[in-house]
Amino acid sequence: MDAAGASCSSSEAVARELLLAALQDLSQEQLKRFRHKLRDAPLDGRSIPWGRLEHSDAVDLTDKLIEFYAPEPAVDVTRKILKKADIRDVSLRLKEQQLQRLGSSSALLTVSEYKKKYREHVLRQHAKVKERNARSVKINKRFTKLLIAPGSGAGEDELLGTSGEPEPERARRSDTHTFNRLFRGNDDEGPRPLTVVLQGPAGIGKTMAAKKILYDWAGGKLYHSQVDFAFFMPCGELLERPGTRSLADLILEQCPDRTAPVRRILAQPHRLLFILDGADELPTLAAPEATPCRDPFEATSGLRVLSGLLSQELLPSARLLVTSRNATLGRLQGRLCSPQCAEVRGFSDKDKKKYFFKFFRDERKAERAYRFVKENETLYALCFVPFVCWIVCTVLLQQMELGRDLSRTSKTTTSVYLLFITSMLKSAGTNGPRVQGELRMLCRLAREGILKHQAQFSEKDLERLKLQGSQVQTMFLSKKELPGVLETVVTYQFIDQSFQEFLAALSYLLDAEGAPGNSAGSVQMLVNSDAGLRGHLALTTRFLFGLLSTERIRDIGNHFGCVVPGRVKQDTLRWVQGQSQPKVATVGAEKKDELKDEEAEEEEEEEEEEEEELNFGLELLYCLYETQEDDFVRQALSSLPEMVLERVRLTRMDLEVLSYCVQCCPDGQALRLVSCGLVAAKEKKKKKKSFMNRLKGSQSTGKQPPASLLRPLCEAMITQQCGLSILTLSHCKLPDAVCRDLSEALKVAPSLRELGLLQNRLTEAGLRLLSQGLAWPKCKVQTLRIQMPGLQEVIHYLVIVLQQSPVLTTLDLSGCQLPGTVVEPLCSALKHPKCGLKTLSLTSVELTENPLRELQAVKTLKPDLAIIHSKLGTHPQPLKG
């Protein structure tokens, strides 16, 4: 704590004594004039209400001034008001006594004056940012706009895409308008959130966006009328700094000098913005050391200060901008008070190109690199992540300078990161056993840090592993100097947290070389741990799978002189096969479609606890995708007969991963999507087409319909190696574009035998499209399960399927409402000579006397047709999903 904080009580007593003496020197007329001037001359936009001033004597005024402005600022205010009231002799005496007894540090600048000084300081300090290779670049020139999609902090249903989900808001490019909207909330007329969470995966650009927000605030572009002071707080650094500090100390460290009026700044918390970068690094609140701090002047650990801010027990009216990875958002939201969420989605296609031209200073090189990446569809897709885009640009620049073939650039994040390491080593002319040994130690440092939640490393850490001054240290670690209690503390961190996680995964394989007894032990400990796919080691585990591909293992052997035992890969495969059906498969399937009112609150709490489990299935698919080995994926999925994704707002990358796994799945595989968002958010197009282009467009008759978010999955289903046999879509919104793509897939999917459409939001046009696919001559779907309200409005499409489908043998309408207006055309279709249906399931369907009579007549006419209903003499079978 600073000296001012340490002597808080004594300085307050002195300030009170000075104020009381000055005010008691005033006559009744002077005191009255002082009160009026105090009312009419607000400081920093604030003044004491007249109702509290009107009848106050000297003692009352002293109390109110100290309460309203804080002790030392109150002396400054009093001195200036006395001068305005033309009581100059008392003002002069107060100034002299203030200088003698309190010093001049706080008496020179008002908060308004210091605000301008602080903004100028922030503009100077943050005008440049260091890239991962320690090169400094101007933030305005390097920052490339990101797509940011507003989310919701209230209903989980809105975030996760249940059957009642709203249309997702359009992702907007991160200009000042988008940043200004963050604290407005979804409803402009409702209460504005005090906490905004910028969420997104590793390397997506959350930190850069947060720094740009700070820089634009200092430049007067953001929150000008709402925020007087904004402070950037890297959570990882604060957690690892030794000693204790108060929030006031942390604020003072960011100010241009030690004369900052910290107490007056903190006296107006509603005018403050704290940017907490990397809040996912905080441990759980259950530990005693995480008890939130409530006093901004209490010297304590960084964890307690951050916990106090996040829980709003410390400065509850202050604004918070928090960055966090998606995987830990559920755990973080338990600490926050009504947060507004926004998702950082990386670069749009337009901004990918802008980034390339900003990175390459030579326009011809930029054009060549961008054209190459654009032609590599998978690599181009990966470049939506800014850190991956930076690595790709760095590697391509090195290969250009060395005259090498650009085609060696790879297609997964793992392969891109591995190529980055090897390219950096080659460009530096370093190789051989010494550098290989250094790299092993660097990987070990990364692994130690990941396991301990540590991102900052001391010089002693580097010396212990003989990395101090090494070549790999200068290439892959960035140096930081932090103010310490007695001296500057030097720390090191990896160029990006995701890169540290990649090196940690590589460490497991480098350590696997050796005695058979120790070979795969550490790898198995990683994948078997709860953190492996559900916790903070999820990305490390994903990288591990990517490194286990045959091609990557060969690269590791060539570049690092390491032979990875084959049993490591086989043991990992057996681990995947041992997962059987993840817990997520049964979480939603066993729930009733509609919860009772008294159970809703309890169910919501259970969903929060299960949130990380709900990601298990998708995370496992990401791991398999990262291998890019069809045979490995097929073997892994052979023991997982059903893939289930529940309550996931699927992104394009999620669909890319799912589609690859579906393409590789063995015969008999089932896929169930439950309450998944399948609506793509459209990017806003600002430029209008020219008149000629619009004229050409209107004359064109063969325009291709827009692709749906589900198209990659549909394209995977029609490949000959795809063994997907059962597809169930439950409680999903299915736009017409999705139905169109799914219909095309139904026509030719080689293995699909069963389709379930359960409680989805389908339009009449969508069902018409699906019926066309099901009635197609080459469609192989034999079982169709449908649950939907309002079947009477679309029964004619179902009739078409029954009359025209060459292979449909089972129709399950369990749980549907079947009035007479539906049963009559249904029975007519069943009697049709071309209808080959063998089983009609009507479990839990309420039927009146006339429909029952018509169905009985169908049974008499077609004795081979089994109609399952309790009143028709057949036993019901439960509906799956």
From Swiss-Prot:
Polyubiquitinated with 'Lys-63'-linked chains, promoting the interaction with PYCARD/ASC and formation of the NLRP6 inflammasome. Deubiquitination by CYLD decreases the interaction with PYCARD/ASC. The keyword Repeat applies. Residues 596-611 have a biased composition (Acidic residues). Transmembrane segments: none annotated. The keyword Cell inner membrane does not apply. GO terms for cellular component: canonical inflammasome complex; cytoplasm; cytosol; membraneless organelle; NLRP6 inflammasome complex; nuclear membrane; plasma membrane. Residues 1-129 form the Pyrin domain. ATP binds at G200, P201, A202, G203, I204, G205, K206, T207. Residues 154-175, 579-611 are annotated as: Disordered. Keywords: ATP-binding, Cell membrane, Cytoplasm, Immunity, Inflammasome, Inflammatory response, Innate immunity, Leucine-rich repeat, Membrane, Nucleotide-binding, Nucleus, Phosphoprotein, Repeat, Ubl conjugation. Detected in several tissues. Expressed in renal epithelial cells in medullary thick ascending limb of Henle, as well as in salivary gland apical epithelium (at protein level). Isoform 1 is widely expressed. Isoform 2 is primarily expressed in kidney (at protein level). GO terms for biological process: acute inflammatory response; acute inflammatory response to antigenic stimulus; antiviral innate immune response; defense response to Gram-positive bacterium; defense response to virus; host-mediated regulation of intestinal microbiota composition; necroptotic process; negative regulation of canonical NF-kappaB signal transduction. Residues 194-510 form the NACHT domain. GO terms for molecular function: ATP binding; double-stranded RNA binding; lipopolysaccharide binding; lipoteichoic acid binding; molecular condensate scaffold activity; pattern recognition receptor activity; peptide binding; signaling adaptor activity. Signal peptide: none annotated. It is linked to Defects in Nlrp6 may be a cause of salt-sensitive hypertension. Homomultimer; forms the NLRP6 inflammasome polymeric complex, a filament composed of homopolymers in response to pathogens and other damage-associated signals. The core of NLRP6 inflammasomes consists of a signal sensor component (NLRP6), an adapter (PYCARD/ASC), which recruits effector pro-inflammatory caspases (CASP1 and CASP4). The poly-Lys disordered region (350-354) mediates the formation of liquid-liquid phase separation (LLPS), an essential step for nucleation and formation of the NLRP6 inflammasome complex. Acts as the sensor component of the NLRP6 inflammasome, which mediates inflammasome activation in response to various pathogen-associated signals, leading to maturation and secretion of IL1B and IL18. Inflammasomes are supramolecular complexes that assemble in the cytosol in response to pathogens and other damage-associated signals and play critical roles in innate immunity and inflammation. Belongs to the NLRP family. This is NACHT, LRR and PYD domains-containing protein 6. It comes from Rattus norvegicus (Rat).
